A protein has these predicted regions:
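Conserved N-terminal subdomain of the carbohydrate kinase-like
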Residues: 23, 49-108
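Glycine-rich phosphate/adenosyl-contacting loop at the front of the ribokinase-like
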Residues: 1-55
Length: 108
């Protein structure tokens, strides 16, 4: 069992646009995916995918969507333990246009 520490976890949200990004206008989304992120979470995912049991230790409130996102991965051998904190994990958003151009918007 390996325990990873993720002091700054995130929810990584990727949205795809059906056309080019129109700055200053309303843009409709083609699709949206949300995955847990942060270096420790990512390492724990890779370990679990490789057959090694891993626990990601993250600062998160008990109702933080990050915890549900990690659990929803359904990876055997991947566990998550939360250290209670106030507030929610940051959300990083990537906007991908049809030509492959990606714009990232990361919370501090």
């Amino acid at each position: 069992m390996i325990v990873t520490l993720t002091p700054n976890p995130s929810l990584d949200r990727t949205v795809t646009l059906p056309g080019p990004l129109l700055r200053g206008a309303v843009n409709r989304l083609g699709s949206v995916t949300v995955e847990p992120g942060g270096k420790g979470v990512n390492v724990a995912r890779v370990l679990a995918s490789s057959g090694q049991e891993a626990t990601a230790l993250v600062p998160a409130a008990s109702d933080d969507p990050l915890l549900r996102a990690i659990d929803s991965l359904g990876l055997p051998g991947l566990a998550c333990r939360a250290v209670p904190v106030a507030g929610a994990a940051r959300i990083n958003t990537a906007v991908t246009e049809p030509d492959g151009t990606t714009t990232k918007l990361n919370e501090s």
